[in-house]
Amino acid sequence: MTTQTLLIELLTEELPPKALNNLGNHFAASVAEGLEKAQLVDGAAEFTAYASPRRLAVQVKNVKAVQADQKIVKKGPAVANAVKDGTPTKALEGFARGAGAKIEDLTIIHDGRQDVYAYEYVQTGRPLGGLLEDIINQAVKKLPIPKVMRWGSSTFTFVRPVHGLIVLHGGDVVNVSVLGLQSGNQTLGHRFLSDGEIIIENADSYAAQMRGQGKVVASFAGRKAAIQTALEGQARRLNATVAADEALLDEVTALVEWPVVLEAGFEEHFLAMPQECLILTMQQNQKYFPLLDQNGKLMNRFLLVSNLQTEDPSHIIRGNERVLRARLSDAEFFYKQDQKATLESRLPKLANVVYHNKIGSQAERIERLQSIAAHIAKALGADAAAAGRAARLAKADLVTEMVGEFPELQGTMGKYYARLDGETEEIAEAIEQHYQPRFAGDKLPESKIAAAVALADKLETLVGIWGIGLIPTGDKDPYALRRAALGILRMLMQYGLDVNELIQTAFDSFPQGLLNEKTPSETADFMQARLAVLLQNDYPQDIVAAVLAKQPRRLDDLTAKLQAVAVFKQLPEAAALAAANKRVQNLLKKADAALGAVNESLLQQDEEKALYAAAQGLQPKIAAAVAEGNFRTALSELASVKPQVDAFFDGVMVMAEDAAVKQNRLNLLNRLAEQMNAVADIALLGE
């Protein structure tokens, strides 16, 4: 059966730029999935997604014009139950009626267990046109669109008004109706660079015709690559690097159909402002690409991506420079105004900034942060007074003009204003870094003072918000407590502090009775659960569970423990020791009295005497290895007692009739369990 390329295009008004690439990929994948399910392609569909500001399209290779005929076999009742005394039973008659067949049309087949009646027929394949309308409509319905709209007198809804529909199979139009539009082969090109309608001659010529006649690079990936190449080329010419992240590049790609990269500039005096402010203004407000020199310093040149190609782009450049100049002038004004007051003098204004109405203002919060940060700094061996000072000033920039205009600069502007106020560099850096880590993979605070303030900030948030009942549920976490917990955990894995003690310190900083009394224990459990999530990114679940079963309160040696358990798990003796440990734990649950020391005089059998001797010899070795942080050695020592453990369980009845002997054997197993689980609960390995 011959196949041809299928093309589908929805011509729209300008689509949301931040969602464009996702919409294009979802639409293409859904169409391809529909074709696969309808068996209009053999195997996995080979498709290309297209997405530009005014269109979503998909091109699928090797699509059939008609489904292949299918042999259908409907199975009915067993032969043994289908005929009685030569007469068809009601079961057989009902099957034939339901299948739309006569009894004489039925056949007998073997279904692998028995002979059954069956109705076999050939289902004629349906044409592409009879299936495609539903496939496209389903693809449209599945698009991840949070808000839809209606347009004109239409009752149909979509993310933006849709004005055209192309459906081509090879060079032939496939007649379908989608979103109230009849399919055709006409589309529009670039809004300004293209004239009139474009007739797509063939599904395979779509991208080339859109580029040549329409001045549209239809492929999102193609436009992005072209923009990136042009940006890098311009930057090299200026001996600079482009300051841009993937999100900005994606957004700009979604704003243009015919990208042209241009160079522009601004006055040097603006460089006196913090470069973070200038970069944010250019990237966020104007979608420009700032340039950095070889030392990472901002230049007064930038790159912009225009959607127009002209012989003389100077008017485009001047227009963009004029807009940016106005933006930077506003920022410069805010910056100068802010310098008229110190951070310290701004603190009273924090009383008017509500943190949460149940736990007070930012001014009240600052009091708590100071005490928590000073406590943590002291525990870290850092300057408690400096940490307290940094915490005192950490939120002062929230009431500055600059942060009011650019909230993303909180902390950063505090650093610059602290320097201007004569604060130490360590305090200034701590003010900026106390928000770190802001997200997964973000860097940690660089100094102990900064870490103390960062820990204080996140602990106070976690404990305070949790304590008033705003607990994360499902996908709802308005105060980002999960992120705060992960940030705390990452820092504690670097610094050897007791997580439960820190939680209690944060809890005690609030007025008595303000927070739920269960908050410390609940947040500790929450942290333990988040720790498991964090560690399972790098280690198998059973290894993480084994280490966390010990409920470690200091996390700075977690990585060493996890690595040691991973090595132990590979030992030949590991599986048997894990099973034995599980058996030991189950037996210990049956103890009638408190477990204590082993009484050597009650050891009766050679096997238990041998195990006791082995445990006695093992104890100092494991204790020394754990004390030195040599967890691999501690775990590897366990392999030496496997013969004695095996012999004990093979030859000794633990639950003896003599109560004293039974208790002594349980005491022995408890002694063994303490050593086996000194690093991790190895009974959990393999589960």
Curated annotation (Swiss-Prot):
Gene Ontology molecular function: arginine-tRNA ligase activity; ATP binding; glycine-tRNA ligase activity
Pfam families: DALR_1, tRNA_synt_2f
Positions of transmembrane segments: none
Subcellular location as annotated: Cytoplasm
InterPro entries attached to this UniProt entry: DALR_anticod-bd, Gly-tRNA-synth_bsu, Gly-tRNA-synth_heterodimer
Highest taxon listed in the record's lineage: Bacteria
GO cellular component terms given for this protein: cytosol
Protein's GO biological process: arginyl-tRNA aminoacylation; glycyl-tRNA aminoacylation
Keyword Repressor in record: no
Keyword Protein biosynthesis: yes
Family of the protein in this entry: Belongs to the class-II aminoacyl-tRNA synthetase family.
Protein name: Glycine--tRNA ligase beta subunit
Protein species of origin: Neisseria gonorrhoeae (strain NCCP11945)
Classification of source organism: Bacteria, Pseudomonadati, Pseudomonadota, Betaproteobacteria, Neisseriales
Gene: glyS
